[in-house]
Amino acid sequence: MNLYESCVRGALRAYKLTLSPLIGRQCRFFPTCSEYAAEALIGHGPVRGSWLTVRRLCRCHPWGPSGWDPPPPPRRKGAKWTCET
């Protein structure tokens, strides 16, 4: 585990121990928003992972969708975008 991954996991653990009990378990999705954030930040890095996390948090509200919503799989390094018709 590298330093970045340790920091992400530590920050999410601190959230789960301090703020999460006050807010309650109200996430409409699985994995929960904090688990999604960990997977997105570690799998995609700080920039894209943060963007994916913000998008997910914007979808997590009482009138939004619910259910299974995992982060997209990480892009392979060196992979090129292609468009098949």
UniProtKB/Swiss-Prot annotation:
InterPro entries: Membr_insert_effic_factor_YidD (IPR002696). The keyword Cell inner membrane applies. GO terms for cellular component: plasma membrane. It is found in: Cell inner membrane. It is a peripheral membrane protein. It comes from the Bacteria. Keywords: Cell inner membrane, Cell membrane, Membrane. The keyword Cell membrane applies. Pfam families: YidD. Could be involved in insertion of integral membrane proteins into the membrane. Belongs to the UPF0161 family. PANTHER family: MEMBRANE PROTEIN INSERTION EFFICIENCY FACTOR-RELATED. This is Putative membrane protein insertion efficiency factor. It comes from Phenylobacterium zucineum (strain HLK1).
